[in-house]
C-alpha cells in the first residue's frame, strides 16, 4: 500500500488550482487551427421554429415522496446548446417548411375553374413525361399478365382429363411386331459397326523398307561342360564314397534359383541389309598342302636349290643326289649360272618373285 493512499487528505488541497488556471497563457494552436475556437460577437446563432428545450416530463417523476413541490408554476429555464464557432464556409440553411403565400380566396377559385375548362391534353404539362412512363409501364405489365394467363390456360388444356383406353390383344401384337423390326434393324447396325471396329483394330501397319529388330531377353545361364573326372580303381579296392553320397539330399534345404543372364538379339529383315551393315571381306587364301615326292608325306621343308619340298633328311639327300645326276647328264639349268661365272641372268618380270625364275625339277 502506497504512502499517498494511506495518509489523510489535506484541507487546503486544490486552493491554488483556480489561480493557476487563470494565469495559464492561451495556446496559439486553439486560436489558429480551423479558424480558431473563440466566439465572435456578431455571430448570431441559428434559431429554429421550435425551441431547443428538453422534453417536459411530469413533475411527479423528479420529486421524492418525502419532498414537497416548491411551486407548480415555475418552469425550467431552457438551456441552449452551444456549438463551436469557426470561420469556415457554411452552406446557407434552407427552411424545411415551405412558405405560405397569402393569396385571396377569389383568385384560387378562379384558377381552379380555368383549369377545369382546359382539355385533358393541356393540363399538367410538367408531368406529361412522368404520366407517359406510368402508362407504358402499366401497358407492359398488362400484356405480361395476359401472356401468363394464356400460357396457364394452354397448360391446363394439355393436362386436362385424358383417359387412355386399354389396348386390345391384336393392337398389342401389332405394336410388338413393329418393335421387333426396329430392334432387329438396330441390332444389325450395331453388329456392322462392331465388325468394322474389329477390322480397324486388328489391321496391322506395315512399314515399307528393311527393318532391324532389337530384342533383349533373359535366359537361364548354361555353363560350359568341363573335363569329367573319373575315379579309377587301381588296387582293386572299393572306391571311396563320393561327396554327393555323404551330403544329405538337397530337398531338405532351400533351393537357390538357377542363375540367369541377358541376351540381346539383332534381327535383319533381309540378307542385303545384313551385308550392308556387316560387309564380309575376302576370304583368306588357304595354303596348298604340299607332299614330299620321296616319302609321300606332308612336306615340312623346301630345298632352296631345287625348290622341291621334302619331309625328312633322307628325302633331302635323295633329292640332292638326283640333282647332281641331272647336272652331269644335262648340264646346269639357267638358274644355276648364278652360282658360277657367266652372263648375268635376265631381269625378272614385274610381279614375279625369285621362285618364278627357278626351274622345276620333277623327280620320277
Swiss-Prot record:
Annotated positions of the Phosphoserine modification: 127, 129
Keyword Transcription set for record: yes
Record Pfam families: YL1, YL1_C
Compartments (UniProt record): Nucleus
UniProt feature, compositional bias: Basic and acidic residues: 127-142
S-S bonds: none
Cellular component terms per the entry's GO annotation: NuA4 histone acetyltransferase complex; nuclear speck; nucleoplasm; nucleosome; nucleus; protein-containing complex
Skewed-composition ranges (Pro residues): 341-351
Any GO MF annotation of the entry: histone chaperone activity
InterPro entries for this protein: Vps72/YL1_C, YL1_N
Acidic residues bias spans: 40-75
PTM field: Phosphorylation is enhanced by ZNHIT1 and promotes the interaction of VPS72 with histone H2AZ1.
Keywords of the record: Chromatin regulator, DNA-binding, Isopeptide bond, Nucleus, Phosphoprotein, Transcription, Transcription regulation, Ubl conjugation
GO biological process: chromatin remodeling; negative regulation of transcription by RNA polymerase II; positive regulation of DNA-templated transcription; positive regulation of double-strand break repair via homologous recombination; regulation of apoptotic process; regulation of cell cycle; regulation of DNA-templated transcription; regulation of double-strand break repair
Region (Disordered): 1-165, 335-357
Ranges of the DNA-binding region feature: 156-206
Coiled coil ranges: none
Cross-link (Glycyl lysine isopeptide (Lys-Gly) (interchain with G-Cter in SUMO2)): 115
Function (record text): Deposition-and-exchange histone chaperone specific for H2AZ1, specifically chaperones H2AZ1 and deposits it into nucleosomes. As component of the SRCAP complex, mediates the ATP-dependent exchange of histone H2AZ1/H2B dimers for nucleosomal H2A/H2B, leading to transcriptional regulation of selected genes by chromatin remodeling.
PANTHER family attached to this UniProt entry: VACUOLAR PROTEIN SORTING-ASSOCIATED PROTEIN 72 HOMOLOG, YL-1 PROTEIN TRANSCRIPTION FACTOR-LIKE 1
Family from the record: Belongs to the VPS72/YL1 family.
Subunit text: Component of the NuA4 histone acetyltransferase complex which contains the catalytic subunit KAT5/TIP60 and the subunits EP400, TRRAP/PAF400, BRD8/SMAP, EPC1, DMAP1/DNMAP1, RUVBL1/TIP49, RUVBL2, ING3, actin, ACTL6A/BAF53A, MORF4L1/MRG15, MORF4L2/MRGX, MRGBP, YEATS4/GAS41 and VPS72/YL1. Component of a NuA4-related complex which contains EP400, TRRAP/PAF400, SRCAP, BRD8/SMAP, EPC1, DMAP1/DNMAP1, RUVBL1/TIP49, RUVBL2, actin, ACTL6A/BAF53A, VPS72 and YEATS4/GAS41. Also part of a multiprotein complex which contains SRCAP and which binds to H2AZ1/H2AZ.
Protein name per its UniProtKB record: Vacuolar protein sorting-associated protein 72 homolog
Origin species: Homo sapiens
Gene: VPS72
Amino acid at each position: 500500500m502506497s504512502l499517498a493512499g494511506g495518509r489523510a487528505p489535506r484541507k487546503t488541497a486544490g486552493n491554488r488550482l483556480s489561480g493557476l488556471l487563470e494565469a495559464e497563457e492561451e495556446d496559439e494552436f486553439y486560436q489558429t487551427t480551423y479558424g480558431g475556437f473563440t466566439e465572435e460577437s456578431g455571430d448570431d446563432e441559428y434559431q429554429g421554429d421550435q425551441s431547443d428545450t428538453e422534453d417536459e416530463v411530469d413533475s411527479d417523476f423528479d420529486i421524492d415522496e418525502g419532498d414537497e413541490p416548491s411551486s407548480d408554476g415555475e418552469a425550467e429555464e431552457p438551456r441552449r446548446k452551444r456549438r463551436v464557432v469557426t470561420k469556415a464556409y457554411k452552406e446557407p440553411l434552407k427552411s424545411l417548411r415551405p412558405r405560405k403565400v397569402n393569396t385571396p380566396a377569389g383568385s384560387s377559385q378562379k384558377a381552379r375553374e380555368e383549369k377545369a375548362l382546359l382539355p385533358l391534353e393541356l393540363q399538367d404539362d410538367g408531368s406529361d413525361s412522368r404520366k407517359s412512363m406510368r402508362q407504358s409501364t402499366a401497358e407492359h405489365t398488362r400484356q405480361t399478365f395476359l401472356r401468363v394467363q394464356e400460357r396457364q390456360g394452354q397448360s391446363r388444356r394439355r393436362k386436362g382429363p385424358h383417359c387412355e383406353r386399354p389396348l386390345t390383344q391384336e393392337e398389342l401384337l401389332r405394336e410388338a411386331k413393329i418393335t421387333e423390326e426396329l430392334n432387329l434393324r438396330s441390332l444389325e447396325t450395331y453388329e456392322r459397326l462392331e465388325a468394322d471396329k474389329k477390322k480397324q483394330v486388328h489391321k496391322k501397319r506395315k512399314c515399307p523398307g528393311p527393318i532391324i529388330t532389337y530384342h533383349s531377353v533373359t535366359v537361364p545361364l548354361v555353363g560350359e561342360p568341363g573335363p569329367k573326372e573319373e575315379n579309377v580303381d587301381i588296387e582293386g579296392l572299393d572306391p571311396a564314397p563320393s561327396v554327393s553320397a555323404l551330403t544329405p539330399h538337397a530337398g531338405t534345404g532351400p533351393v537357390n534359383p538357377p542363375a540367369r543372364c541377358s541376351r540381346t538379339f539383332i534381327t535383319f529383315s533381309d540378307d542385303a541389309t545384313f551385308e550392308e551393315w556387316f560387309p564380309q571381306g575376302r576370304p583368306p587364301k588357304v595354303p596348298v598342302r604340299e607332299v614330299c615326292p620321296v616319302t609321300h608325306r606332308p612336306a615340312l621343308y623346301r630345298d632352296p636349290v631345287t625348290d622341291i619340298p621334302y619331309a625328312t633328311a633322307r628325302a633331302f639327300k635323295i633329292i640332292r643326289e638326283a640333282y647332281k645326276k641331272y647336272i652331269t647328264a644335262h648340264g646346269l639349268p639357267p638358274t644355276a649360272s648364278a652360282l658360277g661365272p657367266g652372263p648375268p641372268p635376265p631381269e625378272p618380270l614385274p610381279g614375279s618373285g625369285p621362285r618364278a625364275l627357278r626351274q622345276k625339277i620333277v623327280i620320277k
